[in-house]
């Protein structure tokens, strides 16, 4: 048996809103060497089902979610994530709070709390149909089972501007924060499946090419062995601590950071989950601020439009007593 974990982020570039890390963990009834081939076969089938209208749109979240598409831009993203929830035999969440608990998230306990509060009470689904999600989850089961693949869990972690800025003040940079959150989530998912061969697939973190130090820190590893550090992929083997660290037959864990990592299905599902959570959060954020300042145009939080939004809300933010670091992520 092998555990395969996919990790990706949403919201790394914006100045407003949370940085969200998504993770998906899968069980493969075979050796690690077969994982890439098995998941490639599953990806081909899922893509064919999607194009035929019979399966979820599991893929790169940046392509699945498009504000220019006809109809609701949220629908395919939401359908993909809620189908994944059902595929792991979890009940479908009916509120944002249910979904946050399922993914291991809680709202920030800082001055910005009111901006995000609606997220816990909003009804789900927002844009898709429950029956469609169930039908597509059944399709996923029928595709995974003959390949010896099963979705074990979904999880997210997030960091809001106040905590992000506080981390910068300790000497971390933006890339450090992303890597520590991502690998911290991967380590948590791995701990749920102890004594098991494991593969962790991550999308590359910006232009960063060397990860041995942060991998060693997040996994408390005695030694991290670099296998490759190229322009397209960085790959490592984790050698565990403890008296059995060098014993033969001990489970191995490999970690890879790849350009275009979303092409691997576990990473794609993680990417979509992170993106869905961020979009729900920004929806709650924009509704809060529209109530505070009628006529204010919503924002996705990316730098150019975030500056427009920041200028237009300056007076109201001052009235509410919100300091700049509570809402504006510095990097």
Language model: regions and residue ranges:
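RNase H-like, Mg2+-dependent phosphodiesterase core
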Residues: 1-331
């Amino acid at each position: 048996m092998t555990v395969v974990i996919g990790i990706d982020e949403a919201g790394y570039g914006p100045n407003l809103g949370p940085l969200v890390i998504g993770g998906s963990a899968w069980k493969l009834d075979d050796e690690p060497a077969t994982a890439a081939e098995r998941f490639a076969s599953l990806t081909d089938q899922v893509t064919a089902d999607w194009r035929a209208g019979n399966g979820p749109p599991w893929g790169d979240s940046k392509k699945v979610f498009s504000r220019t598409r006809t109809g609701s831009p949220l629908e395919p993203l939401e359908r993909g994530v809620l189908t994944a929830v059902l595929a792991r035999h979890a009940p479908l969440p009916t509120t944002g709070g249910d979904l946050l608990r399922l993914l291991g998230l809680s709202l920030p306990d800082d001055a910005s709390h009111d901006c995000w509060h609606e997220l816990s009470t909003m009804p789900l689904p927002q844009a898709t149909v429950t029956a469609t999600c169930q039908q597509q989850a059944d399709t996923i089961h029928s595709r995974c089972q003959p390949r010896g693949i099963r979705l074990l869990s979904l999880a997210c972690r997030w960091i809001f501007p106040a905590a992000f800025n506080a981390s910068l003040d300790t000497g971390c940079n933006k890339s450090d924060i992303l890597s520590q959150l991502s690998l911290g989530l991967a380590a948590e998912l791995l701990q749920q499946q102890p004594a098991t061969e494991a593969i962790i697939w991550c999308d590359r973190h910006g232009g960063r090419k060397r990860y041995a130090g942060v991998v060693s820190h997040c996994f408390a590893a005695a030694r991290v062995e670099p296998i490759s550090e190229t322009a397209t992929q960085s790959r490592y083997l984790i050698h565990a601590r403890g008296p059995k660290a060098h014993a033969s037959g001990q489970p191995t864990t490999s970690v890879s950071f790849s350009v275009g990592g979303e092409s691997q299905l576990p990473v794609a599902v993680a990417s979509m989950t992170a993106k869905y959570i961020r979009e729900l959060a920004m929806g709650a954020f924009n509704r809060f601020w529209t109530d505070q300042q009628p006529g204010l145009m919503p924002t996705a939080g990316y730098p150019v439009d975030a500056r427009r939004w920041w200028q237009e809300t300056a007076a109201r933010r001052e009235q509410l007593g919100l300091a700049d670091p509570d809402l504006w992520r510095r990097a």
